[in-house]
Amino acid sequence: MLERYSSQNHIYQFLERKTRDTFPRSLLLIGESGCGKHHVCDLIKNKLNLDMQDISENLNFDFLMQLYERPQPYIYIIEASKISVKEQNTILKFIEEPLKNSYIVILAENSNQLLLTILNRCQKLIFNPYSIDELRSLTNNELVLKIAKTPGQVTSLLANNLEDIVALSNKIIDKIGTANLPNVLTISDKLAFKGEKDKFDIECFSRTLNYLLVEKIKTDNNIKYQEMYKLVSDWNRERKAPTVVQNFLFERYLVKMHELMRN
């Protein structure tokens, strides 16, 4: 898949040149959600002909010590969005003293998700922005093309009921200040915080709400919409923390938006 996008040629060429002997023991892939980080992991797995294991949920010292005792080499995947600062400190030894014949690949949406000590010890591959023409090869839906920034985001938006997500987002923007608070809090019930299939995908919802707020700000100079945009941005940043209770966090920001637009 990756090779079809000229904007990511540098990543494909990097992988083509590498062998087991020359591949970095600690690699950091940085790019927006849906940019292809997991696809690159599959390419690495095939290139190195090794088994791959996501260890994001098991990052404690005892578990990492068990990995040192494994006789067979592995590719270990760590997702930055799923680990705490304490867990990042734990994996420093893992990075500084690599396992024999094994490799670590860390996935992050941006460098701010990781400690500087980790950033400095990993080789980095950064995804370039995708062009509108590259994304247009996936869809002609103009609204999707205005919202999405990566192929994965295009696919996700197309798979969801975008019309209903837009309606919900516009309802928040236009009416959250006049609705009563109990009704406002029911918005949380519509989002798939636990991956529910019959609810709206959180990533699709957040990107759509962001886009529609930007469009609103362009046509309405009410400073409250700029403040609402900041609240949504803060929510998007905070919800990336691995230990946050997603629905409680979202409800807290719904209350803030309700109070902002009510006054």
What are these regions (language model features)?
Residues 30-33, 55-58, 78-82, 109:
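Structural motif
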Residues 89-95, 107, 119:
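"Short basic amphipathic alpha-helical interaction patches in structured regions
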Residues 47-57:
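Conserved catalytic segments around the Walker B and adjacent sensor/switch elements
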Residues 71-76, 99-105:
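Loop/turn-to-beta-strand initiation segments
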Residues 13-18, 58-76, 81-82, 86-94:
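Conserved alpha-helical scaffold flanking the Walker A/P-loop in AAA+ ATPase domains
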